[in-house]
Amino acid sequence: MEFQKILVPVVGSEADAEAIKLAVKLAKKEKGKIWSVYVVTIKRALPLDAEIKPEIEKAEAILDHMEILAEEEDYEVETDILHAREVGPAIIDEAVERGVDLILMGVKHKRRFGQFSLGNVVPYVLKNSPCPVILHQQ
């Protein structure tokens, strides 16, 4: 498959680093574009444009790290911080707005009493994505 536009949502886990490296490999083949986004969740009591400094600083550090990882592979990644009430819908909205061909997400292996759990965001993205989704397990 050929992917010209790849969206890589990140949360700051080790799986994100592997996901960005995989995105670079996929994008290099077609000289595609990669966007890495971090979604800052805004509580309903606050306006959507509220500045939550610690969360913004965390997002900037994570996205800077993604840029460095891509540069190590001689590739450029555009980064963006999104403000939203919920992460899943923000990722889908971004994918639609940018017209991406692929959403690539790094997921941590979580076990709960012997069962595999993907949390809330990944199932939402899988169900509502306008394009293929690749999950890269750490």
Residue ranges of model-derived segments:
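Structural beta-alpha unit
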Residues: 1, 71-103
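Small/aliphatic-rich secondary-structure junction motif
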Residues: 1-50, 69-73, 78
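Short secondary-structure boundary segments
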Residues: 38, 106-108, 137-138
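A short acidic, glycine-rich active-site loop
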Residues: 51-61
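Glycine-rich, Arg-bearing micro-motifs that act as flexible, cationic patches
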Residues: 105-127
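Short, acidic/small-residue loops that bind anionic groups at enzyme active sites
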Residues: 124, 128-137
